[in-house]
């Protein structure tokens, strides 16, 4: 069966499963080295001084952005993490003093006491991506909705974080899908 015989949602589900399987097959040592390499590529992002960067706390076998977030903090950027809220994600400040609470999805988020920030740069987890900046998330649409809301108040640079093995030749984009502006993998940064 060709992909032309199925809906974009079905194609995405198949690609998501394939990419997550590839990611799961990576060795523990490779995952650690890849996560550390993100920080080595921090200057390739070419971020404006003092911008606010939204990261994420990794779940399952996602590439770990914490070394990159530490490198960004050392360069003077303010950091924040997503919190699932209605109608879309909000972002709370991440500092060394931040207290965390359980945030669902097996992750932690800053407590409600942390300041809510509007990021200039959004670092996003993903299941799969292609060379045009299309991404497949985990199917809930949290980041697509957050991007739509954030873009109402100004420019937003959306950067996916992933392992190279998560790249697919072509990811279908539906009208509600928000493309990335760039991707950062263990091999470096690419702008779309």
Which role does the model predict for each range below?
Residues 87-93, 134-136, 158:
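Short, well-ordered strand-loop elements centered on a beta-strand within folded domains, enriched
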Residues 58-61, 127-131:
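Short glycine-rich anion-binding loops that position phosphate/pyrophosphate groups of nucleotides
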Residues 139:
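Short polar/charged helix/loop
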Residues 2-117:
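N-terminal active-site beta-alpha-beta segment that forms phosphate/nucleotide-binding
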Residues 109-110, 125-128:
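A structured binding-face within diverse protein domains that lines the active/interaction site
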Residues 64, 87, 142-143, 167:
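Short phosphate-engaging motifs
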Residues 1-10, 14, 21-24, 113, ...:
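Surface-exposed, charge/polar-rich loops and edge strands
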């Amino acid at each position: 069966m060709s992909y032309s015989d199925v809906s974009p949602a079905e194609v995405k589900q198949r690609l998501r499963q394939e990419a997550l399987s590839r990611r799961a097959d990576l060795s523990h040592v490779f995952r650690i080295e890849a996560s550390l390499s993100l920080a080595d590529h921090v200057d390739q992002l070419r971020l404006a001084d003092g911008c606010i960067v939204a990261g994420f706390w990794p779940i399952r076998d996602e590439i770990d952005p914490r070394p990159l977030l530490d490198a960004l903090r050392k360069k003077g950027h303010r950091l924040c993490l997503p919190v699932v809220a209605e109608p879309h994600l909000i972002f709370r400040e991440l500092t060394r003093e931040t207290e965390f609470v359980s945030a669902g999805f097996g992750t932690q988020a800053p407590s409600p006491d942390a300041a809510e920030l509007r990021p200039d740069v959004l670092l996003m987890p993903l299941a799969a991506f292609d060379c045009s900046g299309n991404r497949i998330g985990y199917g809930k649409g949290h980041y697509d909705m957050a991007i739509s809301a954030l873009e109402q108040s100004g420019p937003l640079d959306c950067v996916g974080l992933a392992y190279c093995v998560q790249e697919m030749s072509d990811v279908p984009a539906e009208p509600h899908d928000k493309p990335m502006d760039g991707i950062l993998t263990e091999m470096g940064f690419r702008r779309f």
